Amino acid sequence: MELKLLNSNGQEGAVVNASDVVFGRDYNEALIHQVVVAYQANARQGNRAQKDREQVKHTTKKPWRQKGTGRARAGMSSSPLWRGGGRIFPNSPDENFSHKVNKKMHRAGLCSIFSQLAREGRLSVVEDIVLEAPKTKLLADKFKAMGLDSVLVITDTVDENLYLASRNLPHVAVVEPRYADPLSLIYFKKVLVTKAAVAQIEELLS
């Protein structure tokens, strides 16, 4: 698989030969969907809480006697049938939302995403991205010259200047290959990978 190599002005020059195992896979929408949903589910935390009839603060006194009133029998006002009573199946902060995806499926899903990005022209390779200082304007001007506004940068090692400069740009993220997640790969309009990172991605996913 040949990937486009961009220069500092965003113009296409030479090409980089990449592994077909990682960058030349068929598009598998069902697998990609499963991997993305699992990633989102595993990022969820239990922050919902409701009370059952035991936790609701109510008296345990019987509202009225069992027989003779003509009304429906009732044991206590915390009953789920009553207004202000507890929930029958309350949401709990201990709820587990995680989805399990096998390692082979996860790797195959990432390969399918990388391959589709390459086919759509959303994946490009750069020699390296070097900044002289941790200035947001320097990085913003560099991406503007390359015609990029929403970009995920994957580098072999995250340079401190590059990382600090990218933090204040709303649609820019800088990660190492091992931290490239399926949701970010799909979310950003463009994915820039350094030449050294291409080899790392192939090693991780082959």
From Swiss-Prot:
Region annotation Disordered: where it falls in the sequence: 45-85
UniProt biased composition (Basic residues): 58-70
Keywords from the UniProt entry: Ribonucleoprotein, Ribosomal protein, RNA-binding, rRNA-binding
A Gene Ontology BP annotation from the UniProt entry: translation
KW 4Fe-4S (keyword) present: no
Highest rank taxon of the organism: Bacteria
Gene Ontology molecular-function annotations: rRNA binding; structural constituent of ribosome
Keyword Metal-binding: no
Gene Ontology cellular component terms for the protein in this record: ribonucleoprotein complex; ribosome
Family annotation (InterPro entries): Ribosomal_uL4 (IPR002136), Ribosomal_uL4-like (IPR013005), Ribosomal_uL4_dom_sf (IPR023574)
Pfam families noted in UniProt: Ribosomal_L4
UniProt family annotation: Belongs to the universal ribosomal protein uL4 family.
Subunit structure as annotated in this protein's UniProt entry: Part of the 50S ribosomal subunit.
HAMAP family: Ribosomal_uL4_B
Role according to the record: One of the primary rRNA binding proteins, this protein initially binds near the 5'-end of the 23S rRNA. It is important during the early stages of 50S assembly. It makes multiple contacts with different domains of the 23S rRNA in the assembled 50S subunit and ribosome. Forms part of the polypeptide exit tunnel.
Protein name according to UniProt: Large ribosomal subunit protein uL4
Gene name of this polypeptide: rplD
